[in-house]
């Protein structure tokens, strides 16, 4: 039997149109390490996509859905052990531990390289290594960047075709010496000769590793979502945030939307919310009854890359080309535009299958179907669910859909120059304390709001606060460097723009989730959030009033347009009030965060907290 070192090198099959010698040498190195049976260079064509989908249907990874119900759409169901991002197996391997900071998992880069070298040795044996070139952002945009992912998963290839600008055109932009982020991914399940594959190969040992200084990503053991689609959180946030730190721009966990007034004035807003706070719903918001003439358009629902433009303003692109959204809870009531987007050309993962070859998930309809095949391939009925509590779809079940199919897509969504941002919005899920909406008085106060935002991880009992998980800027799992340095980067960027005379975006903090004495949400949310958005835009134009609070500026009841909605002043008081004892407790919690981050914390943040305390004492 041949020793591994004696294995005949695999043919690289480099296409004539690939001219980048550094890229070719890297592919050769990784192929020598991982030892795939063959190497395929992906061109991003429809024919390639269809062929790989059919290959996965034959292999049991995917199921073709009823074309009369969901044209050209598929359902994939993962291994039950491989269903979500694995934060505890996600590492930032900066040269110095302090550059990763206390909120990231750090490992020494040299030791990690040795560990991964052992795991990746022969990891693709029996499989195909796909070379997946992709652009994050419109091809050739000054805000865009290129990556190349080497993966042994055809599921990754087809998802990357939807989620990024993937294929041959990327090599034209890359040329012979262009910069790219190298991404290496393996499901970690090599096949011996004659060994039968499984429907969803993965490995109990998982690593998602980032090397900030060399801009590399290595992922082992998972075929799912952000662990395997390395353009998404790994590149577009963790690596890109470090690039932004070094180059003077921002990579943010933010939606981007356009808002056009009845008079034709257009605004652009970027908003950051942690998971389960309605980011995709807000990105695709439909103005409610009574707000005729207003229009909301979608540029992105998850990630924004933001760079200072020649005009001194901050310009943003959505670096993605698709939506990788959470399915459960999505319905025509909660997100009509998303449901319209999902009618064709979609890959669903870990949702349930109906008897007529369509998909279903919790929250899609008021009444579930009488019978389903659940995400684990088992029979499911409402009676079984009532008896066992078993969900038909996994709570983190996903859809992958082309952005161009979104009915509310903004005509500027692929503008290579990006769109100029007028306002930033930050929000969490809090049943008490945090008002419906607050405007920061200045950039520093806005950074403070974003740095201290959080969401309750447990349902709050009546009169009690839930356990609050701080999620600064909604970036806690995604910031690729020290969180204190990240705050400082925001502060410095604001100062630098102010010094040039630029108009900075206003910063707002929102909370749709305040509860009343009955434990129910007071604010109706969804489309009605447009009323809050309209107040913000009125503030930008100097047309809307506001009331000074200890913590920023909030609207009075009369400052909100209530046309078409019955919402009493008493209810409004429940969602806008500032409870001083609760805020004293809140500031103590802010202190806990600042203590954790004390080593490099910018002094502007404790000074802002002190100013809030002074106003409370006045």
Swiss-Prot record:
It comes from the Bacteria. Mn(2+) binds at residues 233, 253, 302. The keyword Nucleotide-binding applies. Keywords: Cytoplasm, Decarboxylase, Gluconeogenesis, GTP-binding, Lyase, Manganese, Metal-binding, Nucleotide-binding. Its cofactor is Mn(2+). It is found in: Cytoplasm. Pathway: Carbohydrate biosynthesis; gluconeogenesis. It is an enzyme of class 4 (lyase). Coiled coil: none annotated. Its main location: cytoplasm. NCBIfam families: PRK04210.1. Monomer. Belongs to the phosphoenolpyruvate carboxykinase [GTP] family. This is Phosphoenolpyruvate carboxykinase [GTP].
């Amino acid at each position: 039997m041949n020793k591994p070192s004696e294995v005949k090198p695999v043919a690289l099959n480099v296409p004539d149109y690939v001219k980048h010698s550094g890229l070719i040498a890297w592919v050769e190195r990784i192929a020598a390490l991982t030892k795939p049976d063959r190497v395929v260079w992906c061109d991003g064509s429809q024919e390639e996509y269809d062929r790989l989908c059919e290959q996965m249907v034959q292999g049991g990874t995917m199921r073709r859905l009823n074309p009369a119900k969901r044209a050209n759409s598929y359902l994939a169901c993962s291994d039950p052990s491989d269903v979500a991002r694995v934060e505890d197996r996600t590492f930032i391997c900066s040269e110095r531990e302090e550059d990763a900071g206390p909120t990231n998992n750090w490992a020494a880069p040299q030791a990690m390289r040795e560990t991964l070298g052992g795991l990746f040795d022969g990891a693709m044996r029996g499989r195909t290594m796909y070379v997946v070139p992709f652009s994050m952002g419109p091809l050739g945009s000054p805000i865009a960047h290129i990556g190349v992912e080497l993966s042994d998963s055809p599921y990754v290839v087809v998802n990357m075709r939807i989620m990024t600008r993937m294929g041959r055109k990327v090599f034209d932009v890359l040329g012979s010496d262009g910069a790219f982020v190298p991404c290496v991914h393996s499901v970690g399940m090599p096949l011996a000769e004659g060994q039968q594959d499984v429907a969803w190969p993965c490995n109990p040992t998982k690593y998602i590793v980032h090397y900030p200084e060399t801009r590399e990503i290595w992922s082992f053991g998972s075929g799912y979502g952000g662990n395997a689609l390395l353009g998404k959180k790994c590149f577009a946030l963790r690596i890109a945030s470090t690039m932004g730190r070094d180059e003077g721009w921002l990579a943010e966990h933010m939606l981007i939307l356009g808002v056009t007034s009845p008079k034709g004035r257009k605004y652009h807003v970027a908003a950051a919310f942690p998971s389960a706070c309605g980011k995709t719903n807000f990105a695709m918001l439909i103005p409610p009854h009574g707000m005729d003439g207003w229009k909301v358009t979608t540029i992105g629902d998850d990630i924004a890359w933001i760079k200072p433009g020649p005009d001194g303003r901050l310009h943003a692109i959505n670096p993605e080309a698709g939506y990788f959204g959470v399915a459960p809870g999505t319905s025509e009531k909660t997100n009509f535009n998303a449901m319209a987007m999902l009618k064709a050309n979609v890959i669903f993962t870990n949702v349930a299958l109906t008897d007529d070859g369509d998909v279903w998930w919790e929250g899609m309809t008021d009444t579930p179907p009488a019978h389903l095949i659940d995400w684990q391939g088992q029979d499911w009925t409402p009676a079984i669910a009532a008896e066992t509590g078993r969900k038909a779809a996994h709570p983190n079940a996903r859809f992958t859909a082309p952005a161009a199919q979104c009915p509310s897509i903004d005509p500027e969504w692929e503008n290579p120059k990006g769109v100029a941002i007028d306002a930033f919005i930050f929000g969490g899920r809090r049943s008490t304390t945090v008002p419906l909406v607050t405007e920061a008085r200045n950039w520093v106060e806005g950074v403070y709001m974003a740095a201290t935002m959080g969401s309750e991880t447990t349902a709050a009992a009546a009169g009690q606060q839930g356990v609050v998980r701080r999620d600064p800027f909604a970036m806690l799992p995604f910031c690729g460097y020290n969180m204190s340095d990240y705050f400082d980067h925001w502060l410095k960027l604001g100062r630098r723009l102010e010094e040039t005379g630029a108009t900075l975006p206003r910063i707002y903090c929102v909370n749709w989730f305040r509860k009343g004495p009955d434990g129910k949400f007071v604010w109706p949310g969804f489309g009605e959030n447009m009323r809050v958005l309209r107040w913000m835009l009125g503030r930008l134009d100097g047309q809307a009033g506001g009331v000074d609070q200890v913590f920023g500026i909030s609207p009075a009841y009369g400052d909100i347009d209530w046309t078409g909605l019955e919402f009493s002043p008493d209810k409004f008081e429940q969602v806008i009030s500032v409870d001083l004892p609760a805020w004293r407790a809140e500031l103590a919690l802010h202190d806990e965060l600042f203590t954790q981050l004390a080593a490099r914390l910018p002094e502007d943040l404790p000074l802002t907290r002190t100013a809030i305390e002074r106003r409370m004492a006045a």
